[in-house]
Amino acid sequence: LRASLERLLEPLGGMSAFVKKGNSVLLKPNLLTAGRPGKECITRPEIVYCVAQLVKEAGGKPFFGDSPAFGSARGVAKANGYLPMMAELDIPIVEFHGKGYETASDTFNHLRLSKEAMNADVVINLPKVKSHMQLTLTMGVKNLFGCVPGKMKAWWHMEAGKDEIRFGEMLVETARAINPQLTIIDGIIGQEGNGPIGGEPRHLRSEEHT
């Protein structure tokens, strides 16, 4: 996996093209829930581990955070096997706290976004490929909705049931505001069906390419 990530980043200049010495680097995985370990609801820990290694080798100071739909970032990380890896690399796990930020759109200039994400020197977005009942598919843009902390996330999901277009526009504005320097999608095993939480694992590579 580490070698695959290095090959992926090599044409872009490697991790050092995105991370400079001393940069604070948010690693933003999908930490949806602690409730279904093994069902591919979250970004796989080994991806975050390898990316964190590359960040540290580039001189960055990685930290790890999300605003899960259910529970705390630390609780979801613990349930899904993250803690030993994070402890080995001495990477702090942070809970997100909201603050109002202006966005490029007057319609959504009241968005509350994670202070931790907005204050990071670098954001590395690490989403999971999953089906999504409301949006069909969740990947890079939708993962940044995890930077909307607390009760506002539930409110926006209810709004999606009323107006999917407006919800999608809000997601775009959130992504533009967070503006991640790098997105690496976990497609080792996706999730299909009743996603993003109730689906089943799905291998994305066909047999002839395995």
Question: Where do the language-model regions lie?
Answer:
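N-terminal and secondary-structure boundary signal
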Residues: L1-E208
